[in-house]
């Protein structure tokens, strides 16, 4: 499935021809290069390995150098992603925004904002206890288990804990505008992650669902 590695710049708004305001997220793309291929004969499936953003020289180890020794004019990359089912490219090729020209909707994967340790009301949208006088708890979790049977708290019970910092995919975001000169696209709505975080933009898997 076709995709690119981009950077979330932030949100803004644009006006459509009829005057309707549309909130959009700006995603910027540095050059994306094909740095490797997988084939059915050798690996059991077809895929392209794509990289973006040059790695700092202090971070380049000998094993990493070895992976790029057969690629001309392609520096080791910081972000490396595998896209399955893609053909038609060779190692060293650059994939640009023209890949999205005919695409109306995209799926975007990013890492959500980290919120730190949060209570059950914020983390799981619990309603909490009564706020009135005489109540013994207001924002506490409450009971997490049963009586003598089974006499324990089950794994996976919703509790307070670390919130955010997880991979999340938003599907069917409309591509509002493609700016090839600035190597950026505008998509309708919000995208997971903080400003400056890197995201994976793919052709929508379930358009119109």
Swiss-Prot record:
**Can you name one GO molecular function term for this protein?**
structural constituent of ribosome
Record keywords, A-Z: Ribonucleoprotein, Ribosomal protein, RNA-binding, rRNA-binding
Q: Where is this region: Disordered?
A: 127-152
Q: Where does the record place Polar residues bias?
A: 143-152
A Pfam family reported for this protein in Swiss-Prot or TrEMBL: Ribosomal_L3
Q: Which GO terms describe its cellular component?
A: cytosolic large ribosomal subunit
Query: Which Gene3D superfamilies does the annotation name?
Result: 3.30.160.810, Translation factors
Q: Which InterPro entries match?
A: Ribosomal_uL3, Ribosomal_uL3_bac/org-type, Ribosomal_uL3_CS, Transl_B-barrel_sf
GO-annotated biological processes: translation
Role, per record? One of the primary rRNA binding proteins, it binds directly near the 3'-end of the 23S rRNA, where it nucleates assembly of the 50S subunit.
Q: Which family does it belong to?
A: Belongs to the universal ribosomal protein uL3 family.
- Report quaternary structure and partners: Part of the 50S ribosomal subunit. Forms a cluster with proteins L14 and L19.
**Can you say what this protein is called?**
Large ribosomal subunit protein uL3
Give the species.
Borrelia hermsii (strain HS1 / DAH)
Gene that encodes the chain: rplC
